[in-house]
Amino acid sequence: MSNLTPREIVSELDKYIVGQNAAKRMVAVAMRNRWRRQQLDPALRDEIAPKNIIMMGPTGVGKTEIARRLAKLSASPFIKVEATKFTEVGYVGRDVESMVRDLMEIGIALVRAEENEKVRVKAEARAEERLLDLLLPGGAPQPAPAQGMGGLTFDLSASHSGGQAIPQPPAQADASQASPPTGTGSAPDSRSSTREKLRTLWHGGKLDDREVDMEVEESGGPQVGVLSMPGLEDVGSQVRDMFSKVFPSRRKRRRMKVRDAFNLLTQEEADRLIDHDRVSDLARERVEQTGIIFIDEIDKIASGSTQKSSDVSREGVQRDLLPIVEGSVVNTKYGMVRTDHILFIAAGAFHFSKPSDLIPELQGRFPLRAELSALGKDDFLRILTEPHNALTRQYTALLQTEGVHIEFTGDALREIAAFAEETNAQTENIGARRLYTILEKILADLSFEAPDRSGDRVTVDSDYVREHLADVRANKDLSRYIL
């Protein structure tokens, strides 16, 4: 677990998110408290539960991004779900426990990737030896293709290797021109020499683009269409997993490049080296101790919401959420997962409701509240320039791939920021996402013509911005559809 201090966490979040300091400080303290809890005695550690957070603010101000960056910073399993996708038990829709099962799948993928990286060098070494076994010609004299080991056929002619023929041992020479070696050690020595020559060619990249036929395991397995009704996806997944264990895995022959064959062999060897039971145990522990579940649109299931629905009980969804948030045990295919120490971050705009419209029991499970402010012109200007992944840097890098170099002037950025604020005020306020639509409109022609303008340098100034937004500014109704 990361032992960054709250100040360091906020500093890292500042690299990608502008403003919203109160929310950043709150999640930084929540993350630091997890580290503090791990330093305690086990008896006291189990008594300390995370303080769940509700973020309030309009769309596009950074609620989801704060939680996502926090999870990435701490290498924690993270999942974003929407409260409106869940329904009360007995209705058609996903049950709330599915979010924990999905989080466990993410945890498994996260830990498996880490374990793969640990054994990568050893797996690649083993895969290389298997690849050489496949490439090394057999003992039977055949013109071409030659039959390799492991059920792989390989054309050894020079026409597929860029003009360079793969060396073959004397055992494969034409019987009419060469006699079998009489010495007992000559054949193994020749085979070893050929193997090393193949290794040299492989390391030099001379074999990457050659094609081979290789038997691989079918990843899909038998397609069992069972219980595919809405709301029963989890049950159907478990039944399919059961059938996949009953039916033997099928293999099929595929033609692929040697580089792709090496990658498949590396993955096979990594799977053999990894202890999958240990992966499940580590993933379950990480999910239980450091998992983060981000519940978006929590305001849509509050009783004060003006959106009515006759077939879904919003209060029922809240009551189903209670045991998960408070701490319960959820059955997954990797074992039982406790939710006592998973951090829940709920978020919503709360335009037509307020946190107090949630049922009191659920309010009590989210003791911390952070209000995110709407973005203005100055915030938009900072978003365009300060973050490491600023939109201007993204568009500049994208067009550079076509050989077009663009430069945004300061007055152009101020013009874009002012127009974003104006459009958000006159239409729907979508926060920083407005910058995407404006920049796409400004650079639409340039992006289309970029392949024909390689080597050009384009300066985007305020006049350029006003020219490309003139039609939208002149027609306010048009701006509602385009921006």
UniProtKB/Swiss-Prot annotation:
ATP binds at residues 18, 60-65, 296, 361, 433. One of its GO terms (cellular component) is HslUV protease complex. Residues 136-212 are annotated as: Disordered. This is ATP-dependent protease ATPase subunit HslU. GO terms for molecular function: ATP binding; ATP hydrolysis activity; peptidase activity; proteasome-activating activity. Residues 136-147, 171-181 have a biased composition (Low complexity). Residues 192-209 have a biased composition (Basic and acidic residues). InterPro entries: AAA+_ATPase (IPR003593), ATP-dep_Clp_protease_ClpX (IPR050052), ATPase_AAA_core (IPR003959), Clp_ATPase_C (IPR019489), HslU (IPR004491), P-loop_NTPase (IPR027417). Belongs to the ClpX chaperone family. HslU subfamily. The keyword Chaperone applies. ATPase subunit of a proteasome-like degradation complex; this subunit has chaperone activity. The binding of ATP and its subsequent hydrolysis by HslU are essential for unfolding of protein substrates subsequently hydrolyzed by HslV. HslU recognizes the N-terminal part of its protein substrates and unfolds these before they are guided to HslV for hydrolysis. GO terms for biological process: protein unfolding; proteolysis involved in protein catabolic process. A double ring-shaped homohexamer of HslV is capped on each side by a ring-shaped HslU homohexamer. The assembly of the HslU/HslV complex is dependent on binding of ATP. The keyword Chaperone applies. It comes from the Bacteria. Keywords: ATP-binding, Chaperone, Cytoplasm, Nucleotide-binding, Stress response. Residues 182-191 have a biased composition (Polar residues). Pfam families: AAA, AAA_2. It is found in: Cytoplasm.
